[in-house]
Amino acid sequence: MRKPCPPRAPLQHLTVHQPVGLIVVEFATRRRLRINGTLSDTGSDRLRIDVEQAYGNCPQYIQNRQLHTAPASARSAEPVRHGHTLTQDDIDLVRRADTFLIGTTHPTRGNDASHRGGPPGFVRVEDGQLWWPDYWGNNMFNTLGNLQADPAAALLFCDFTTGHTLHLSGQATLEWTGTGIPGDDDRTGRRVHFTPEQLVAGRLLSLQADSVTAAPDNPPLTD
């Protein structure tokens, strides 16, 4: 897998023989594929992964986007920012997001990556922390199961218009709330709270989408 990226981007610091969880999302067709394995080789422009699991997931909550390479005029040489506290720009990016990716881990079964989507505003930001309602899905519970075993998690938000990205790492916990309360958008009675500990922000996305069609199964916001 090719991985051209700035010197201080997170992918530059991976070491071999560690477990890896990937997700590949084709937004134009609303398809996704999860790949888990072990990192066997890394260089300045590539990753090699020994695949142990690969399986598709349903198209629920994937927004339809036609991605294309951003023109040079839309790209920025602004520096990558590392920090521990969300800025207002970070909060605004999260609040307008309709998509994010989440990485979780298990003490003995490796790492996993998954997709979360919903209407803009489905991820709430309060007092420097994030939370979002869990939606009905395919009942595999890979992400929630991992969080029960290990609360470490990483989130990636992308602005497909500006190219800005926000990578957060921290701790996530599952909360059972009871159904029907404000913010329980899909009436599952559960939500995930996330406390950021480190962040990497920049204009790292080389792809753009000029328009978006919302997933037909997005539930409305209830708060």
Where are these regions (language model features)?
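Binding-site signature for planar aromatic cofactors or substrates
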Residues: 1-223
